[in-house]
A protein has these predicted regions:
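Residues forming the flavin
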Residues: 1-321
Length: 321
């Protein structure tokens, strides 16, 4: 059994910000103590940073740091202090389930299968992508179909080519950023398909990604069917209102159809719709944020509140002794 008064699940932007904020507040409230020893961060990847590690485009930190940073640069603003903080960090460790007795089941190469006891749990586990398979498009499921996150990881982290001619489903920020990335990689983006009557995402991204590179956007439409054996050959695009269809020949389909907060570790809790007061959510697992700066702000407040609750408990115990 591992004991950690404050346990944080997720070492991305939210997890690091919450951990650093909690450590700072504990140092203020419990001077002379080892604040870092009170906090443990679990991360399923080998390094902290989360999705920021695959974001090489600019647009981060405009609010938090008044600087136009890449995702990697934004991450480094926290990764350095986090590494030097003395906060316990367990990489390559997956959180499986939290229990009512304030324990969490985890598994990793350093810990094996173990239980971690905590006083306060901060869930900073981000989101997972809604897959193309969750949609009702007919046809085959050949290779060449990716979620936006998968495509971004393969291009930016693995330096892999995923195709030559792409159609992107979803005009939110992620879809727009991937469209630009494909163009910069020397590929063709034949169309961005959007089910709504207006383009999604931030105006800045629309201007910098779609309008600047003259990428066609087809509104009020969806992908009705997929074609190809072995490799994607094309898609049929259908207008939602008129049902008019158009075939587009392509070898790559990138699906950017939404994010779902990752809360499955809490599946055994909150059966009545309310979570115990010893659990906090922050970042994209709380709700999907438009920018990482607001993720950081919320996470810092969450970490501070958890530290104050822990310090109050410790000081109350000392006064009763």
């Amino acid at each position: 059994m591992i004991n950690s008064p404050i346990l944080i699940v997720g070492g991305g932007a939210a997890g690091m910000a919450a951990a650093l904020s909690a450590r700072k507040r504990l140092s203020e409230l419990l001077p002379g103590g080892e604040a870092g020893n009170c906090i443990t961060v679990l991360e399923r990847e080998s390094e902290p940073g989360g999705v920021l590690r695959q974001c090489i485009h600019h647009g981060f930190g405009l609010t938090r740091f008044s600087s136009d940073l890449t995702g990697m640069e934004y991450m480094q603003r926290f990764a350095g202090p986090f590494a030097a903080s003395g906060i316990s960090f367990l990489p390559d460790t997956s959180a499986l389930e939290a229990y009512p007795d304030k324990t969490l089941l985890a598994v990793g190469p350093k810990t094996g299968r173990c239980r971690i006891h905590f006083e306060h749990l901060i869930l900073a586990s981000g989101c997972y992508e809604r897959s193309f398979q969750s949609l009702t498009a007919a046809g085959t499921r050949p290779s060449g179909i990716y979620t936006a996150g998968e495509a971004q990881y393969l291009i930016n982290r693995c330096h892999a080519g995923i195709g030559e001619e792409a159609v992107i489903l979803g005009s939110g920020d992620m879809g727009q950023i991937l469209a630009r990335r494909m163009i910069l990689e020397g590929k063709k983006v034949l169309a961005v398909i959007e089910k709504n009557s207006v383009c999604g995402g931030l105006l800045k991204n629309r201007r910098d990604c779609l309008e600047k590179y003259r990428i066609p956007v087809i509104l009020s439409s969806t992908i009705a069917s997929v074609h190809g054996e072995g490799r994607l050959a094309g898609v049929t695009v259908q207008n939602i209102r008129t049902k008019e269809e158009k075939y587009i020949s392509c070898d790559t389909l990138i699906s950017a159809v939404g994010l779902i907060p990752e809360r499955r570790v809490l599946k055994g809790l909150g059966q009545d719709g309310r979570l115990p007061d010893w659990i906090s959510l922050c970042g994209n697992c709380h709700h999907v944020h438009k920018i990482v700066d607001s993720v950081t702000l919320q996470a810092e407040e969450t970490g501070k509140a958890a530290a104050e609750k822990l310090a109050f408990s410790v000081l109350s115990g000392l006064s009763k002794a």
